Structures are given as structure tokens and as C-alpha cells.
Regions:
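Bacterial N-terminal signal peptides
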Residues: 8-17
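Basic, often amphipathic N-terminal segments
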Residues: 21-128, 137-246, 252-284
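N-terminal targeting/docking segments
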Residues: 1, 19-22
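Bacterial N-terminal signal peptides that target proteins for export
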Residues: 1-7
């Protein structure tokens, strides 16, 4: 019964969001180059200040210095609001964030999670770029399960608002993707999200926070360097970082996934929402 209600809710959200969206154009998937990036928006959990303080004290300074030594100046200076992503969509329509807020499913209660395990990863192995250095979320506990369930309903509700696939999963990345990833890009505009298939939840979401965003070619030198960085920081934070996410934000995102602007913030405690620029409450 619960599964049936969950499925119907996702389908209803999908239909209501799709009604407000522009047509979805997948023609970029037939091209060898990346799709031109107009604007990407997303739903993310901000990292709490206590987590940022630990990362600033134990990771970020050393990491920035190491990036500069490697010649990765752009990566060392990339602006970002530290976060864990729920879902990203591409849309050139500036009204998209407001539509996302309207379509956003009820968020979960505050999420108790553990951030643990630094690792480098590529958008698609062998594509060359983009690539990232991430810090994962421990895949157990109520907080993780709630995150996964919310990814499923949020993806169903918001993916119809896209105008096509995320540029970073097109071109050389799409060409190197496995079939399961390609199917998600075709149907949801992005890989790495959860969907309902035949009444069952199919999970591909891997929640994490990203410390390095790069479009440099991921050659053997950088692969080795990023493995060393991950090993170094795993030794510094072997137990990870326990924290609680208390809000979820609608944000604007750069090509590689970094947050460049927070637009709306929704409390996980009472569901209230604010316009970040004005500080005023929005919605009911």
C-alpha cells in the first residue's frame, strides 16, 4: 500500500510539473560535443556550518595549495556553496527556480548523516572530463534512507521542468556512459538519480559533497595526484563527520556542478521557505 501511494505521488508530481515546462529537447545527445550551457538549477542540502568549519580546518587549505602546485588554478578558485545534491536540471528559462519551488515535494525531516570517504570520480570513465574530488555520505541509517526516498520523488517532480539534458552529461561523456546511465539521461536529463520502474524504486543516486570541480583532462598524472589527495584526507578524517541537514535549497549551478547562487531555502523542520536574496518568506 505504501509503495502504491509513493508511486502515485511521484506520478502526480511528474504530471503537474510537466504541465508548466517547456518542451524537452534531447537532440544534443546525438552530437559529439558538449551541449551549450545556458543555466542549470538544482535542489541541494547546504553543508551545515560545523561541517564547513571542520573541512576548512583540516582539508581545504591543504587541498587548495596542492591544486595550485598541480597547475589547477581554476579548480583552486572555483566558487561554490558546499552542498550535497538532490537533483540538477538544465533550463534556459529564468522562471525555472520559481516553478521548482512550486513543484518541490514535501522535504523530509532533518537528516542525520555521516560524511565519510574522499574519492576522485569521473563523469564517465574515459571521457576525459569533467571529473571531481568528492566526500561521500555513509550509505546506511535513517537519514540516508530518507535522502534516497526524497531523491526519487524530487527527480520525478522536477525533471519535467528541464529543457533537455545537463550539458555535462552530453557529448564525450554520453558517448562513454553505460547503457543504464544513458537511459537516465534520455528520460530524466541526468544520470545518478533514482526512478520508479514497474512499481519498484531503482536506485542510482550516490549522495556526496564535492571539493574539486574540474574540466582539465583527467590524465594519468592527475589521476595519481587525486588518489593521493583522497588517501591523505581519509587519513585526516578516518571517522568522517557526523552532522544534521536542516534545510534544502533551490540553487543555480555552474557547468560542472558547483553552486553559484542560492535562490530559495526550505526548512526541513517546518517546511517554511524564504527568498534568500530578500530574506522574505515565500509560498504559503
Amino acid at each position: 500500500m505504501i509503495k502504491r501511494v509513493f508511486q502515485l505521488a511521484a506520478l502526480g508530481l511528474f504530471a503537474s510539473a510537466a504541465h508548466a515546462a517547456a518542451p524537452i529537447d534531447n537532440s544534443a545527445l546525438d552530437k559529439a560535443e558538449f551541449r551549450e550551457h545556458k543555466a542549470t538549477y538544482g535542489v541541494v542540502y547546504r553543508l551545515p556550518q560545523d561541517v564547513n568549519a571542520i573541512l576548512d580546518a583540516k582539508v581545504n587549505g591543504t587541498l587548495k595549495a596542492d591544486l595550485l602546485k598541480l597547475g589547477l588554478k581554476t579548480e583552486a578558485e572555483t566558487p561554490n556553496m558546499p552542498h550535497v545534491t538532490v537533483v540538477h536540471i538544465h533550463s534556459a528559462d529564468p522562471e525555472t527556480p520559481a516553478r521548482m519551488l512550486k513543484a518541490l515535494p514535501k522535504p523530509p525531516a532533518p537528516l542525520q548523516v555521516t560524511l565519510k570517504n574522499f574519492y576522485p570520480t569521473e563523469a564517465a570513465k574515459g571521457a576525459g572530463h569533467p571529473w571531481w574530488l568528492d566526500l561521500g555520505v555513509v550509505k546506511s541509517g535513517q537519514g540516508f534512507e530518507d535522502m534516497m526516498r526524497y531523491n526519487t520523488v524530487a527527480t520525478a517532480a522536477l525533471a519535467p521542468l528541464r529543457d533537455g539534458p545537463l550539458p555535462r552529461v552530453t557529448g564525450p561523456v554520453y558517448a562513454k556512459m553505460a547503457e543504464a546511465g544513458r537511459d537516465l539521461v534520455k528520460t530524466m536529463g541526468v544520470s545518478g538519480v533514482n526512478v520508479m520502474q514497474d512499481g519498484k524504486e531503482v536506485r542510482a543516486h550516490n549522495p556526496h559533497t564535492t571539493l574539486v570541480y574540474s574540466m582539465a583532462m583527467y590524465d594519468a598524472r592527475l589521476q595519481d595526484a587525486m588518489k593521493q589527495e583522497a588517501d591523505k584526507f581519509n587519513a585526516v578524517l578516518p571517522e568522517g563527520i557526523n552532522t544534521t541537514f536542516k534545510d534544502v535549497s533551490i540553487v543555480e549551478i555552474g557547468f560542472a556542478g558547483n553552486v553559484v547562487r542560492e535562490i530559495y531555502r526550505v526548512s526541513l523542520e517546518d517546511g517554511s521557505a524564504i527568498d534568500v536574496a530578500s530574506g522574505k518568506k515565500v509560498g504559503s
